Amino acid sequence: MIDEVLLDAEEKMEKAVTVARDDFATIRTGRANPGMFQRVVIDYYGTPTPITQVAGINVPEARMVVIKPYESNQLKAIEDAIRNSDLGLNPSNDGSIIRVAIPQLTEERRRELVKQAKGKGEDAKVTLRNIRRKANDELNRIKKDGEAGEDEVGRAEKDLDKTTAQYVSQIDELVKHKEGELLEV
C-alpha cells in the first residue's frame, strides 16, 4: 500500500517535470526551434489542431523556420495562427511554404522571458508540492487506519521528501538552463 502511494506520487512528479520541460520549449529564445510552435493551433476541418500536426517544420538556419503544410489549402490558416499567437513573429507566405524569420530579442524582452520562465518553474514546483501533500495525506490515512506502522510511514515520508527534492532540483536545473539560453546574446 505504501509502495503504491510512493510510486503513484513519483509518476505524477515525473509527469509534472515533463509538462514543465514542454512549457519551457515554448518560450522563444531568439533561436529558431520547431518546439516554439507546439501551442500554435489552427482550425483544421472544425477541430483545433496544433500546426506541428498539419505541417512539416524545418530549421534551415539559426534564425529561420520553414513551415510546409501537408495540405496547401492550410497555408493561410497557419500563417494567421502564427501571426495571432503570442510569439510575436511575422510569417511570410510564398504560396507553397511559410517562412518565419526569428528576430533578435531585445534586452527588455529577454528579461520578460526570464521572468516568465521563472514563473513557469515556480508553478511546476507548486504542482510537485501539491503531489507530495496529497501523498502525505494518503500515508497519514494509512497510518490512522492501522494498515501500516508509524516507522514504516515515517520512512515512506522521508523517501517522499527525498523524491520531491530530487524533482524540484530538476525544475531548478530547467529554469537555470532556460535562463542561460535567454540571456546568451
Curated annotation (Swiss-Prot):
Entry's localization field: Cytoplasm
Cellular component terms (Gene Ontology): cytoplasm
Main function: Responsible for the release of ribosomes from messenger RNA at the termination of protein biosynthesis. May increase the efficiency of translation by recycling ribosomes from one round of translation to another.
Lineage per the UniProt record: Bacteria, Bacillati, Actinomycetota, Actinomycetes, Mycobacteriales
Keyword Iron appears in the UniProt entry: no
GO molecular function: ribosomal large subunit binding
Location (main, coarse): cytoplasm
CDD domains, per database record: RRF (cd00520)
Protein name: Ribosome-recycling factor
Organism listed in the record: Mycobacteroides abscessus (strain ATCC 19977 / DSM 44196 / CCUG 20993 / CIP 104536 / JCM 13569 / NCTC 13031 / TMC 1543 / L948)
Sequence similarity: Belongs to the RRF family.
Entry-linked SUPFAM superfamilies: Ribosome recycling factor, RRF (SSF55194)
One GO-annotated biological process of the protein: translational termination
Gene: frr
Keywords from the UniProt entry: Cytoplasm, Protein biosynthesis
One Pfam family in the UniProt entry: RRF
